[in-house]
Amino acid sequence: MSSTNPAETYESYMVPTLFGPWADVLVRSAQPRPGERVLDVACGTGIVARRVVNLVGSDGQVVGIDLNPNMLAVARSAAEREGLAIEWQEGPAERLPFPDGAFDLSLCQFALMFFADRRAALQEMHRVVRPGGRIALSVWQGLDHHPFYRTLDEAIQRRLGMSGVQDIFALGDTKELRMLLESAGFRAVEIEPVAMTARFPNPVAFLAGEIDVDTAAIPSMQHLDAEARRGVTVAIREDMERPLRAATEGEHVVLPFHAHVVRADR
C-alpha cells in the first residue's frame, strides 16, 4: 500500500478493492446510453469515467473533473493505457467550468460529503445538465452502519480530541439527502440503500493507511512533532488491534460497506 504518491496508492489499492466495484453499482443505476454527454464530478483517478466511456460510445462524450491535479494525472495515465477517449479538467465542483445544459448525465461517486458547499455543488451539477437530463451519485451511510470505522473514530477522538472520519459518513440521513437534492432543483429523487463487502489485502498496511489518512487533516495532529505523531499513531493502532483481528480473514481485512445510491432528474 506504500507509495510516495497518494494518488497512485489510491488507484492501485483503493480502486480495485472498493471504488471500482462501487463504480459499477453507480453506473448501473445511472444507465448511461450511447451518444450521451457525461460528466464525472470529483472524478479522482477516473474509475467512474472509465466505466462509462465505452457505454456512451464514440458518439458520446465523457469528461472528468477534479480539484486534485495529482489525481487527474493518474486518471489521464490510466485512460491512456486503456486507450479510452476521456477529457480531464481541473476545477472545483462548486464552480464547474461548463455552459448550462452541457451534459445529459452527471455522476459523483463518494465525494458530495467532502464539498465545502454541498448545495452549491449540486446546483452546479443541476445547471450543467440539460432539462430532462439526470444525476446519479453515491454517499456512504452513517457510522452506525460501519462499526469498524466508528471504533476507529472513537480511538482518534480519544487521542486527538476531534473526529477523523465523521465527514466521510456525514450524509447517511436519507431525509437530509433528499432535501439537499430537491433544494438544488432536482426532482424525482430516488435513494437506494446498497451493501457490499470489501476485501483489503495486508491488514497491517490497511490499518496504517487508514490512520494516516483519517488523522492527516486534524489540527492537533498537524501541530505535533514527528516523534509525537508517531506516538499518537502507535496508540491508535494499539486501540484498533482487537477490531482489526476481528475483521481479518487470512491475509485480508473484510469489511461491510453501506451506501445510498441516488438518482434524480433535472
Residue ranges with predicted function:
Residues 119-120, 126-202, 221:
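Conserved catalytic/acceptor-binding region of the Class I
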Residues 37-96, 120:
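Class I SAM-dependent methyltransferase SAM/SAH-binding core
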Residues 3-7, 19, 45-47, 169-266:
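Conserved Class I S-adenosyl-L-methionine
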Residues 104-118, 141:
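A short SAM/SAH-binding and catalytic strip from SAM-dependent methyltransferases
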